[in-house]
Amino acid sequence: MPGNIVLIGFMGSGKTTVGRLLARDLGWSFLDTDTMVEERLGLPVKEIFAREGEEFFREVEKEAVARVATARQAVIATGGGAVLCGVNVKLLREGNKVVWLQVRPETALKRAGLDDSRPLLQGREPRDIAALLRRREPYYAFADIYIDTDGKEAAAVAREIKEALKAWLESLT
C-alpha cells in the first residue's frame, strides 16, 4: 500500500507549488510527473508538445505515473491531463489519497497563462480555458477530496489538505 498524496487539477491550480510545501511539512518526498517527463526527454513540456504532439507526451507521462505509483510517503503532482488516461487513474488511486485542487478559469489563466511553458494555454482566450476546464472536470471528480484554491495562498492550501487528511495521515504512522 503506497500511502501517497496525489495532487490533480487543471493547469495553474497550484499542484507543484502546494505539493512542494506539503511534502516539506510532512517530511515526505515530492515527485512531479511533468518534471519527470522533461528530465527523461531532456526537453521542456512546451517543446515536447511542439515537436512530438500531445499524444506522444501522454505516453511518456503514463510511464512517469507508473514510476511514481510505486513511491511511498510522497506528495505527487501530476500534469493537468494525466487523469485523461484510465490506467493513470487506476495507478494513482491505489492506496493513495487523491486531492483535486480546484481553480476557476480566470485564476488558472492569471496564474499559468503568462507562463509560456504551458502549451495548452498558449493563445487561448478565457472562454477557451473555461471550455477546456469543463471538459476535464469529470476526469478530476474521482478524487477523495476537493480543495478550492481560488483566493488562497499555497501554504493555506497545504494546511487545508493536511487537516482534511489528518486521520488518514495518522493511520500511516
Curated annotation (Swiss-Prot):
Can you quote the record's cofactor note?
Answer: Binds 1 Mg(2+) ion per subunit.
**What GO annotations for molecular function exist for this entry?**
ATP binding; magnesium ion binding; shikimate kinase activity
Q: Please tell me whether the keyword Secreted is annotated for this protein.
A: no
Q: Could you say which residues bind substrate here?
A: D34, R58, G80, R136
Q: Which PROSITE patterns match?
A: SHIKIMATE_KINASE
- Taken from the record, one Pfam family name reads SKI
Residue positions binding ATP: G12, S13, G14, K15, T16, T17, R118
Reaction catalysed by this chain? shikimate + ATP = 3-phosphoshikimate + ADP + H(+)
Segments spanning the bilayer are none
Q: What are the subcellular locations of this protein?
A: Cytoplasm
Keywords for the protein's UniProt record, in alphabetical order: Amino-acid biosynthesis, Aromatic amino acid biosynthesis, ATP-binding, Cytoplasm, Kinase, Magnesium, Metal-binding, Nucleotide-binding, Transferase
List the Gene3D superfamilies hit by this protein, alphabetically: P-loop containing nucleotide triphosphate hydrolases (3.40.50.300)
Q: In which pathway does it act?
A: Metabolic intermediate biosynthesis; chorismate biosynthesis; chorismate from D-erythrose 4-phosphate and phosphoenolpyruvate: step 5/7
What processes in GO biological process is this protein linked to?
A: amino acid biosynthetic process; aromatic amino acid family biosynthetic process; chorismate biosynthetic process
Binding of Mg(2+): at which residues? T16
Cofactor(s) needed, names only, are: Mg(2+)
Task: State the SUPFAM superfamilies in the record.
Answer: P-loop containing nucleoside triphosphate hydrolases
- GO CC terms, sorted: cytosol
| UniProt keyword Magnesium, yes or no | yes
The EC number(s) this enzyme carries: 2.7.1.71
**Family according to the record:** Belongs to the shikimate kinase family.
* Assembly behavior: Monomer.
Relate the protein's function as given in its record.
Catalyzes the specific phosphorylation of the 3-hydroxyl group of shikimic acid using ATP as a cosubstrate.
Query: What is the protein's given name?
Result: Shikimate kinase
The organism named in the record is Moorella thermoacetica (strain ATCC 39073 / JCM 9320)
